[in-house]
Amino acid sequence: ECDVPWQEEEIKRLVIEPSFQAFQPTSTAGWFCGLNQLDTLEGLQYLDTSKVTNMNHMFSDCALSCLDLSHFDTAQVTNMNNMFSYSACLTSLNLSGFDISQVTDMWSMFDGCSSLVALDLTGFDTSQVTDMSCMFYGCSALTSLDLSRFNTSEVAYMEDMFYECRALISLNLSGFDTAKLTHMERMFRGCSSLTSLNLSNFNTSQVKYMDEVFCGCTALLALDLANFDTSQVESMSAMFKGCSSLTSLDLSHFNTSQVKS
């Protein structure tokens, strides 16, 4: 994915000149990917992204600690998968100006951003997104995440979405429309600081895979799954493994007729 001339070179400082503004790329995929020595990136304001449709892996495995991309024109972008993945040094990320109304793929967008302490995505229009799998995988420093405004009506894939978000104590998914969701395996695996999780709005009628979905949620005190329709589920293996703080769990309504494991 990182097919650029400066790929993985030990660049510490990168400057975009004003003259570069005349260039209007259609893809910035992998542009700064693998620059794991980079500590300074200047002149991003001279990068015209108005024609860009593909930003996958753009800052993947990059050593930058702060990124302000609030000025980016992302109105044409459809692909943001792995855009910031494995950028383990990133502590601050400003995406407040992002128009993601055309984006369909957010797979692993923030995967491995293990130093990110806060993330404001309240302005995100996710109405076209179909894949959110691994989106926040390994964001182990995030303590709260409000995704209540996310439109997930087209999303089929949410597996590993919050995998190993170990510091997360507040997670708001109250606006989630999961009518098309088929994959939610390991969705909350390793969210060991969550004491509560409200999934009362979840429609699971199309879900096939629920294995390890709550595995390792060691602080979870209660879990109400009364609304869960499991009639299509084929896999439930290790679904509640390690949920050592749960004192009661009512699964009497679960339809397990299709379950194989």
Predicted regions span which residues?
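Predominantly recognizes leucine-rich repeat
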Residues: 112, 137-138, 163-165, 189-190, ...
